[in-house]
Amino acid sequence: MSALALAPVPAPTPSWRTDRLPQLRARVLGGGPTGALTALALAQAGWRVQLIDPLSGSQLQARRRAYALSHSSRMFLQRLGLWELLSEVAVPFRSLRLCDLEAGRAIGFGLDDVGSCGTRADGAEAVGWILQHQPLMQRLLEQLEAHAGISLSLGDVASPGGNAESSGSAGPQLPDLLVAADGSASPTRRSAGIRRWRLPYAQACLTAQVRLRGSAPDQAWELFRREGPFAVLPLGDGTTQLVWSAPAERLGRLEALDPVAFLDALATALPERLQPEALLERPRAFPVALELARRFHRGSLALVGEAAHRCHPVGGQGMNLCWRDVEELQRQALRAAAGELPPAAVAAAYGRRRWADVLLTLLFTDLLVRIFSNRQPLLLSCRRLALDLMARSKIGRAHV
């Protein structure tokens, strides 16, 4: 019997694991930091990628903004092979001072509070990093243009660099994956009929770059004030980025002040040891809201970054949350490229796995704003107690 036994018949291979596998294509709509990183991550997963944005490369670089990067973002960039390039322009901060000015409490976070995860690949250590928009986008665009698996269509003219779709094959063909990385107002999300929840804050946010005295060059500050959170982020060479949250009417008045009057107003908002010296750019105010798409996918469409969610800037969580979207999308794209997941299921798998992290982050930032902008006596007492306990607990500081 054994000699006549038939060999087991292998299960038929699904069609998506054969003829379509080498032709996996993605189209990314939106060329900002999240869209650019998405294109690079998908290309590294073996997909052919077309990146489309109505703005030109120079326009995409033109924003004056700074981002706080956490260790989760740094480790993801390392896996993509981008950290060595970006660390050249990322300013590390090795100390973070959290001050509750209403409760009269302050606590410091240093390298001991991040442990071994604070060690960068080049041997330097940091609590986090500050990365300005222009050098970030310059380097991401250079990587996009150099990648053979990526085609750029920026502005009104498609880029001749990147030969993946130069024959026009990505244009008329439907991609296996469509990624909306086109921001909070996302026309792609709206055209897909995906609604969102939106909760405007009573606060707005003002950003400016100033030169300060009294702060170490590698120290960041998170100040909790009665009118809202206030972050002071080091940019190197004595320059700092301010992220000032306050009622919109007040910020509108501050935005209209001349430089001398603005610095005088700024001095009253900062701790005494921080003395403003010079205003380096015109302050700009913008509204702040908590936003959450009601779903992160529809069919082969996946929403990433602010097309899917938006949180208050307190704690510098925004960019890190967006890039964790990219990391999860790449994880599912790798499964599809390996034949473990139908390409048509990538967006759905991504959407399911992102909900918990996004909801927790939005809840965390929202609670920070509501608790630390509240002068209710019981809450003030609780804040003092919480910060006192945290100051005495290394484990507590490590989990902030």
Description of each model-found segment:
Residues T34, G57, A185:
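Conserved Rossmann-like nucleotide-cofactor binding loop
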